[in-house]
């Protein structure tokens, strides 16, 4: 809708009448849905709203910005065993593609869109695998916050060790 027709998001309901547009400053966090994607910056989604999402049956929350979810809301999702992915994991695609572009430029290469997509897919799969590796709790719940933090720490620690600093 946005990319092809340059339409407004609220026009989505014209084509899909079962959808609901929430506009005029209202927040979508009190609506029923399976997936929530907070994508505004810092503290968009709070504890009260997280409780409403859980009560309404959300099964996954993935950040699409830097810290749009408050610590209280994160706690609500984790206590309810909702799949919660922090922005450092789920929003890493844009930064990753920027890095790929810098690599292309420095090596004087030109990758096709398909090659970039394949590299991005590998990066995002690797992020997920590391979150699962380092974030799986004894009960099987994957704590993506813990997984992403430990994976990041391990990457830096291995680099420091490889340089002989420790």
Predicted regions and their residues:
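A structured beta-alpha segment of the ubiquitous adenosine-cofactor-binding alpha/beta core
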Residues: 1-49
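Adenosine-phosphate binding glycine-rich loop
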Residues: 52-166
């Amino acid at each position: 809708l946005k990319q092809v027709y340059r339409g407004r998001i609220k026009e989505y309901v014209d084509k899909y009448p079962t959808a609901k547009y929430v506009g005029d400053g209202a927040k979508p966090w009190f609506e029923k849905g399976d997936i929530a994607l907070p994508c505004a910056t810092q503290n968009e989604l709070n504890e009260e709203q997280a409780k409403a999402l859980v009560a309404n049956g959300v099964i996954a929350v993935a950040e699409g910005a830097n810290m749009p979810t408050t610590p209280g809301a994160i706690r609500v999702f984790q206590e309810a065993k909702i799949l919660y992915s922090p922005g450092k994991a789920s929003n890493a695609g844009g930064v990753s593609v920027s890095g790929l572009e810098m690599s292309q430029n420095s090596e004087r290469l030109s990758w096709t869109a398909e090659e970039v997509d394949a590299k991005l897919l590998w990066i995002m799969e690797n992020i997920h695998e590391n979150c699962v590796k380092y974030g799986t709790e004894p009960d099987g719940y994957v704590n993506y916050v813990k997984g992403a933090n430990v994976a990041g720490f391990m990457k830096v620690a291995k680099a420091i060790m490889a340089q002989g600093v420790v």
